[in-house]
């Protein structure tokens, strides 16, 4: 039942388009105007003063200034100085101190997987940024302390 009514509607529309071409052109113009309006709404209309005054050179200069400020802040205040050099010796006094903190120890740990030294504890001493201050048991008893002061 719907099929004959659809055929009827389509033939009626063709007849209207044929007899009244200006009506079909009006519909086409309305659709065109509607599409133009939608496109206009989608267009970016007001970019603002930031985009209008955009200059890549000044932007790059400002970025460099901000980056140098940030690098200065992080490198000076928060840079942790190395305590050991690349061979695992203390930088402050060039002593090859074992991580057990005994001055005369020849190495009491298993060979380090990175540098093959017997003086490295659980972590390799090469370029390390910290030192053991003391060897303390779980009960809090101090077994050994750092035999000399190491500056920060």
UniProtKB/Swiss-Prot annotation:
Renumbered residue ranges of the record's region Disordered: 1-27
Domain of life: Eukaryota
InterPro entries: ARF7EP_C (IPR029264)
Compositional bias of kind Polar residues: 1-16
Residue ranges crossing the lipid bilayer per the database entry: none
Record protein name field: ARL14 effector protein-like
Gene: Arl14epl
